[in-house]
């Protein structure tokens, strides 16, 4: 059920939020495995940029493949470790996070398809601000922290609030 909720959130965000990059991809450059017809695979890319209009030099901090079984409707989320060494076309072995810096979403999808035998032709790229909007749109997320984590959490609150243009309150108890 968690996968269904996650996928629904991603699709809602993809349609409703303005901080998600929409790009037409050159499908001939994606190296999609056309023999895979029973699954629709979409990649969600969490990028390390604050400016969604300029991805130059950005990397992916998070790579999640949403795999939808077309027959059963089952949805699986697969996280690809950002530091996995994969063969990046024209570069050689490198961390998959760097594929985005070398060629944006097309190079990243090409790398995933060629190395993992997938058929990805769709993606959503989100930055931190977009993730915050998605979380807000579902009413927030409760997290449990320990007393010894409060100080560290409070260190990041002012900068995060400034970036999101929002108010914050320091955490006083776990």
Feature map (PLM): residue ranges:
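Entry/capping segment at the start of metal-dependent catalytic domains
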Residues: 1-73
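Short secondary-structure boundary/capping elements
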Residues: 10, 103-104
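Extracytoplasmic
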Residues: 37-40, 58-63, 72-80, 91, ...
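Solvent-exposed coil/turn segments that connect beta secondary-structure elements
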Residues: 47-50, 68-73, 80-85, 101, ...
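Second-shell loop/turn segments in exported
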Residues: 51-54, 94-102, 116-122
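Flexible, solvent-exposed short loops/turns enriched in glycine
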Residues: 76-103, 147, 158-162
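Generic structural marker for isolated residues within well-ordered, non-membrane alpha-helices
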Residues: 109, 113, 131-132
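Flexible, polar/acidic helix-loop-strand segments at domain edges
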Residues: 136-174
């Amino acid at each position: 059920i968690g996968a269904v909720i996650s996928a629904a959130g991603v699709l809602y965000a993809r349609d409703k939020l303005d901080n998600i990059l929409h790009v037409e991809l050159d499908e001939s450059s994606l190296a999609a495995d056309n023999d895979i017809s029973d699954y629709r695979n979409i990649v969600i890319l969490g990028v390390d940029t604050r400016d969604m209009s300029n991805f130059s030099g950005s990397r992916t901090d998070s790579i999640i493949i949403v795999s939808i079984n077309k027959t059963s409707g089952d949805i699986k989320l697969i996280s690809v470790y950002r530091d996995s060494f994969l063969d990046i076309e024209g570069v050689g072995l490198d961390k998959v996070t760097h594929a985005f810096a070398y060629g944006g979403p097309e190079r990243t999808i090409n790398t995933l398809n060629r190395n993992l035998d997938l058929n990805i032709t769709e993606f959503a790229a989100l930055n931190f601000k977009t993730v915050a909007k998605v979380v807000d749109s579902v009413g927030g997320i409760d997290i449990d922290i320990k007393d010894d984590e409060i100080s560290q959490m409070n260190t990041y609150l002012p900068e995060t609030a400034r970036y999101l243009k929002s108010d914050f309150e320091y955490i006083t108890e776990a």
